[in-house]
Amino acid sequence: KIMFHYRWDLEVDQQYSSRQIISDNTPGLRGTALAKAARAIRDRQVGRMPLVGCTPQNKPIIEQSFHTLLNILDSFVTRDEYLFGTRPALADFGLFGQLKTLASDHTPMLIMRNNVPSVYDWVRRLEDSSGIEGEWHSLAQMRTAVTDLLRYCATYYLPFLRANAAAIAHGQTNLSVELAGQTFEQPVFKYQAKCYARLKSLFAEVDAPPLRTVLSDCDCLPYLE
């Protein structure tokens, strides 16, 4: 939601993103044809914003969640390189997937460069992190950033996933949920309900009491059981 919001909220980002998408996917287009195609993708994506919760009403919570995430990562990357050891994990690359786009789109790029340049640099380095060997941290060595990110999930995302799944289960077309003390509303999203069910089913297969303790301490456990 953060990436989609920043990509299509402001005029300057709409113009940049639509042209970039068309230029990347259809590099042979030029002039009027390029402008026409860019306008079409722009209109389509802007029109989809309410479907994914990117509305003026939700804008404060979405932008707050972005700055909160950046602050967590900023306190981390000034001391460590990877979340779970001296080698990258799927978690690092998962964050990279979204942050790479945010680090190249106009407005979020400026936010990252001006406010958290260390995070901007970290994202850039992650792009060339394949093949790095290293060691995994033990549970006792878990970095504060990991628990901070889990609490972040328990504040901004897991409540949304549960509310979305519950709304679908009750045949509702819209959901409303409190995230970090603010009301967030959007139409239900079936794919995310599928993702939530998969996440819970995978967790049910794990027999790891120490993991349950960490998740409980970070307020994630109630959303996964």
Please describe what each predicted stretch is.
Residues 1-64:
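Internal, well-ordered alpha/beta segment that forms a basic, Gly-enriched binding/recognition surface
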Residues 52-57, 79-84, 105-110:
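Inter-helical turn/loop segments and adjacent helix faces that build the functional surface
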Residues 75-85, 132, 205, 209:
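Surface-exposed helix-capping loop/turn segments at secondary-structure junctions
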Residues 83-103:
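GST superfamily/GST-like fold recognition
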Residues 98-132:
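Short His-centered aromatic/hydrophobic patch
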Residues 138-158:
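Small-residue-rich helix-loop
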Residues 182-225:
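C-terminal non-catalytic accessory extensions
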